[in-house]
Amino acid sequence: YGEGIPMEKLFHLKENNTTVRTEIVAGLTTFMTMAYIIALNPNLLTGFGAEGGSQLWNGVFLATCIASAVGTLVMAFAANKPFAMAPGMGLNSFFAVVVANIVSLTGMSYLQSFQTALCVILIEGIVFIILSVLKVREKIVEAIPLGIRLGIAPAIGLMLLNIGIGSNAGVYSSDGGPFYVMRDFFGALTPSLAKANMGDGYPQMVLTVVTMFVGLFLIVLFAHKKIKGSVLLGMLCASGIYWAGEAIFLHTNPFASLKGASFVPAFGDMAETTLFKFDFAALGEIGWFTVVTLVITFCIIDMFDTIGTLVGLSLIHISEPTRRRG
């Protein structure tokens, strides 16, 4: 249990019926499960690097890493809760839409509109903190039917599953039927059409789909066998299978992208593009009514994301005292 060492004193492992080993495995599993956000967030907010230049991409990338680390450490040491924190898919998607609309409506550069939208996020964050301190958020949670509260987290999970299977792995249901065929990221393709038109991309897509199903099967198998760290082991095995498949069947080096890669954090790019870069002067150009509307919208998205996550992770059930703690 880690008794006699700082881990036990800091996190009350015995009281929470856990061990240092369990926490390490859980931490690694959580990291690998959510690590996609490190690349997805800057890609989403910069149009895969097409908007704002590489400086903005680097700035968002580093900000994502730092914000996730700081948020998770605060949850660990201040709240003593096993929750990892990172940018949410709901908020960042809407943020990208807002930035794009500011560009089209005002003619600002993408970077300036990005920094203007950051002001909206800052205001929304302050409002959200005030609502939490005044326990308004708690009242809102209590007013939501328990069934809806418990359904938010699974709904988010199913959305991510759809994104992962349909967009990344390349699997979708043909005409609403029960059979699945492969597609690329941009649209539906039958296997024969894909093979004829995708060239070298087709074998890679097949390898991706096969690896995904093998990985899922291994996770279920390990869990059925009650092997600790089943999710982590399944992900590691699937990664190894994919890398081996790339080398054997695709005749490519799975680690080629590491050549020439820089491992020095781009603090300069973050300082230039995102660090305290709030363009309050430009808020007037989009109109204060629009600003208020955006703050309210962001606050609602943030609130329901938080409610769904906390309820789902806390396994809050029907008893009234437990519900009030939600």
What positions do the PLM features span?
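Short, Lys/Arg-rich, polar N-terminal cytosolic tail immediately upstream
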Residues: 4-17
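Hydrophobic, membrane-inserted alpha-helices
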Residues: 67-72, 213-219
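Flexible hinge motifs at transmembrane-helix junctions and intramembrane kinks/re-entrant loops
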Residues: 200-204, 217-271, 299-303, 307
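Hydrophobic mid-bilayer segments of alpha-helices in multi-pass membrane transport proteins
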Residues: 89-91, 121-122, 152, 156, ...
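Select transmembrane alpha-helical segments in multipass membrane proteins
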Residues: 21-28, 118, 284-297
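P-loop potassium selectivity filter motif centered on the GYG triad
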Residues: 183-201, 258-288, 295-301, 308
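Early transmembrane hairpin of solute transport permeases
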Residues: 25-207
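Single conserved hydrophobic/aromatic residue that forms the stacking wall/gate
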Residues: 317-326
